[in-house]
Swiss-Prot record:
Native source species: Listeria welshimeri serovar 6b (strain ATCC 35897 / DSM 20650 / CCUG 15529 / CIP 8149 / NCTC 11857 / SLCC 5334 / V8)
Superkingdom in the source lineage: Bacteria
Family: Belongs to the UPF0435 family.
Name of this protein: UPF0435 protein lwe1727
HAMAP family according to UniProt: UPF0435 (MF_00829)
Pfam families the UniProt entry points to: DUF1128
């Protein structure tokens, strides 16, 4: 999958991967985010950071959740 090309499919894929890896409970916040309503480059950055790590401290999980809230335009 080429994530460099912005698409709704890529947004959905990255959000699913992020929320699964972080074991987020309140994933409804990120459901149905439209491509034009998110900062796509910021989403890619968050996705790549999360993908590289295998474990997260509670503080890191909180920070990532805060950043995910900020990606909305």
């Amino acid at each position: 999958m080429n994530l460099e090309t912005p698409s709704q499919e890529n947004v959905n894929f990255m959000l699913t991967e992020i929320t699964t890896k972080l074991k987020m409970v309140n994933v409804g916040v990120f459901e149905n985010l439209e491509l034009d309503s998110v900062d796509y480059n910021a989403l890619i950055d968050i996705y790549q950071l999360i993908k590289r790590k295998s474990n997260f401290s509670p503080r890191e999980m909180q920070l990532f959740a805060e950043e995910l809230r900020r990606i909305r335009k």
